[in-house]
Amino acid sequence: KDRLYLSGYFGRDVFNFGNTDNGIGIEIPWGNATTSLRWNHLFNDKLFMNTSLIFSDYRFEFNIAQSEFELKIFSGINDWNTKVDFLYQPNQRHTIKFGLNYTYHEFTPGNASGRSGDVVFEPDEIFKQYSNEGAFYFSDDFDVTDDLKIHAGLRYSSFQHSGYISFRDYLKNDVTSSDDNYRHIEPR
């Protein structure tokens, strides 16, 4: 038996402040958008699978303007996520869960542009950072007796940052970028 679910959320808020006496205007928009596609599959009465594809988008801006001066700062995070979770229940007293998860992150940290009179500052490229995050897990819940229960598991997590570590490194136009990797096995 199969079931397919599609869901989404979109929310954008804006804070505005203006003062006509000195001609200053401030606008701070921010918000989230997310969508997910989920597929549930029942292999048999003991094995169940849940697969999810998820996209999320977070945006934040700060804009200020006063007659001859403008400043805009933008940042955001986009995530693409895939999860596959299995639940195996050989009997009422024993449940095994296992699965994997992968997320691709795209960070846009604090890009700025501005104007002062006729002088305009606009970056040629938007500075971004990227990372990959993944995990495999396994857990076993076993009720030995009504008073003795065992819950054990392992999770292998990995995080990889790709790209320049700081904006200063980015401005140097280095040919190579820095990659950081973190991997751990975690008992559960």
PLM ranges: what are they?
Residues 1, 44-46, 89-93, 145-149:
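Outer-membrane beta-barrel channels and translocator barrels
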Residues 2-43, 48-49, 57-79:
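Flexible loop and strand-edge segments within Gram-negative outer membrane beta-barrel domains
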Residues 6-8, 51-53, 98-100, 152:
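Membrane-embedded beta-strand positions of outer-membrane beta-barrel proteins
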Residues 10, 41-43, 55, 90, ...:
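Short beta-strand segments enriched in hydrophobic/aromatic residues
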Residues 26-32, 71-79, 91, 127-133, ...:
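Transmembrane beta-barrel outer-membrane domains
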Residues 31-37, 53, 78-84, 132-138, ...:
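Hydrophobic, lipid-facing positions within transmembrane beta-strands of outer-membrane proteins
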Residues 42, 75, 89-91, 139, ...:
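Surface-exposed coil/turn segments at beta-strand junctions on protein surfaces, enriched
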Residues 97-188:
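Signature of Gram-negative outer-membrane beta-barrel scaffolds
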